C-alpha cells in the first residue's frame, strides 16, 4: 500500500512540474507561427480526429502514440493500424503504427506518418511561372513509444520521435519526446490525462540550397563571384501541455474535454463526446482558441476575430469492429471541418488486433 502511495505522490509531483513548465512558456499572439515542425500539430487517429483531440484522458491502443503515450499501456494483444487522409491543399497524410505487450505491465509501439505534397512546379527569380521541372517535399515523423501500467488506475508512457523535413535541396531534422500520464477513478467514472508533447531540439534548415554565388560587397568592378552560404534561423518545436478529462455518463456515452497549452501559438480548448453500441461507435467534437493577449491598436473587431479564432470547426467520426475468428478488424472514418480557405480534413483508418 505504501508503495502505491509513494508512486502516486511521485506522479502528482511530476504533473505539477509539467504544468509549471508549460505555464512558464505559455503562448501568446506575439509568438504565434514562430515554431517549426508544424506537422506535429496535425491530429492523427480516427477517434482522436472525431473528438477534436479531446480524448487524451481515455486514449488507448496504438493510436495513443499521437495523443497520450500513457494509453499505450492498454495494449493487450499484437495490434496495428494504417490510415490515409486528405489534408489541406491536396496533401495526403499516411500513417502506420504497430504495438504489442512486452509483459504484463509494459507495452511497446512504433509508428510513422508521412505527408505527401505531390509534385510542385519549380520556380525561381528568373522563372517565376516555373521552369518546367517539379520537386516533391518529404515530411515524416517516426515514433517509438513505451507504456506501463503502474496500477489498475495509473498508466504512464513516453514516446521518442524523429521529425524530418526535406524540400528540394534543403532539409531539417529534430528529436523530440512526449510524456504522458492517465489516471482513472473507476467509482467516479472519471478519467484524467496529462501529456507534455513535442519537447525537443530546435529545427534548422541547411543544404546546398542555402548556397549563393555573389560579388562581395565593397569590391572593385570585375571582382570574381564568391560562394556564400546563408545560415537559416533555428526555431523550436511546438511544445504543448495537454490536460484532459473524460467522464462516462453511462456505459455507452463518454464526454471529453482537453485544454492545450501551447508555447508558440494560442491555447485551445476542445470538447467531444463518444457513443458506442455493441461494436459500433460514433463521435463528435469541436475546438476553439483561448485568447491570450489584448486586441492590437488600430485593428478592427472583424480582423481581430479572424486573427484569433480557430481555422477548424466541428469534427465527426464513426467506426465498427468486425470479429474474424480470434482477431478483430476495425474500420473507421473521421472528418474535421475547415472553416475557410481549404477543404475539410478527412481520414479513413483500418486497424487490427490478434
Residue ranges of each PLM-predicted region?
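Cleavable N-terminal export/targeting peptides
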Residues: 1-38
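Residue-level signal for alpha-helical transmembrane segments in multi-pass membrane proteins
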Residues: 16-23, 70, 84, 158
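Outer-membrane beta-barrel porins/channels
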Residues: 27-52, 93-354
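A short, polar/charged loop/turn motif at coil->beta-strand junctions and beta-hairpin connectors
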Residues: 45, 74-77
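Short strand-turn segments of transmembrane beta-barrel domains in outer membranes
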Residues: 53-56, 78-87, 336
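N-terminal periplasmic accessory domains that precede
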Residues: 63-74
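Short secondary-structure transition/capping motifs
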Residues: 83-88, 131-135
Amino acid at each position: 500500500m505504501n508503495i502505491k502511495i509513494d508512486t502516486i505522490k511521485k506522479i502528482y509531483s511530476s504533473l505539477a512540474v509539467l504544468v509549471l513548465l508549460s505555464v512558464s512558456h505559455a503562448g501568446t499572439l506575439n509568438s504565434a507561427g514562430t515554431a517549426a515542425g508544424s506537422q506535429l500539430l496535425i491530429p492523427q487517429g480516427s477517434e482522436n480526429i472525431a473528438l477534436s483531440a479531446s480524448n487524451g484522458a481515455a486514449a488507448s491502443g496504438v493510436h495513443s502514440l499521437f495523443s497520450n503515450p500513457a494509453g499505450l499501456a492498454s495494449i493487450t494483444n499484437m495490434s496495428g493500424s494504417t490510415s490515409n487522409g486528405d489534408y489541406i491543399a491536396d496533401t495526403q497524410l499516411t500513417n502506420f503504427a504497430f504495438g504489442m505487450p512486452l509483459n504484463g505491465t509494459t507495452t511497446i509501439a512504433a509508428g510513422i506518418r508521412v505527408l505527401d505534397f505531390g509534385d510542385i512546379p519549380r520556380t525561381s527569380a528568373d522563372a517565376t511561372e516555373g521552369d518546367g521541372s517539379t520537386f516533391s517535399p518529404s515530411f515524416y515523423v517516426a515514433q517509438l513509444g513505451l507504456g506501463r501500467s503502474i496500477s489498475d488506475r495509473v498508466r504512464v508512457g513516453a514516446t521518442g520521435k524523429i521529425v524530418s523535413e526535406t524540400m528540394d535541396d534543403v532539409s531539417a531534422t529534430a528529436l523530440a519526446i512526449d510524456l504522458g500520464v492517465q489516471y482513472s477513478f473507476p467509482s467516479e467514472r472519471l478519467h484524467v490525462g496529462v501529456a507534455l508533447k513535442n519537447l525537443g531540439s530546435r529545427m534548422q534548415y541547411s543544404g546546398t540550397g542555402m548556397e549563393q554565388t555573389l560579388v562581395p560587397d565593397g569590391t572593385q568592378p570585375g571582382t570574381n563571384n564568391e560562394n556564400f552560404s546563408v545560415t537559416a534561423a533555428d526555431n523550436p518545436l511546438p511544445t504543448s501541455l495537454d490536460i484532459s478529462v473524460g467522464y462516462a455518463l453511462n456505459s455507452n456515452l463518454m464526454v471529453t474535454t482537453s485544454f492545450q497549452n501551447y508555447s508558440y501559438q494560442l491555447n485551445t480548448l476542445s470538447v467531444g463526446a463518444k457513443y458506442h453500441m455493441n461494436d459500433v461507435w460514433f463521435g463528435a467534437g469541436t475546438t476553439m482558441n483561448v485568447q491570450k493577449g489584448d486586441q492590437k491598436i488600430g485593428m478592427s473587431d472583424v480582423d481581430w476575430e479572424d486573427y484569433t479564432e480557430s481555422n477548424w470547426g466541428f469534427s465527426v467520426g464513426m467506426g465498427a469492429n468486425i470479429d474474424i475468428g480470434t482477431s478483430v478488424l476495425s474500420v473507421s472514418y473521421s472528418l474535421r471541418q475547415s472553416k475557410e480557405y481549404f477543404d475539410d480534413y478527412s481520414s479513413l483508418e483500418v486497424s487490427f488486433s490478434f
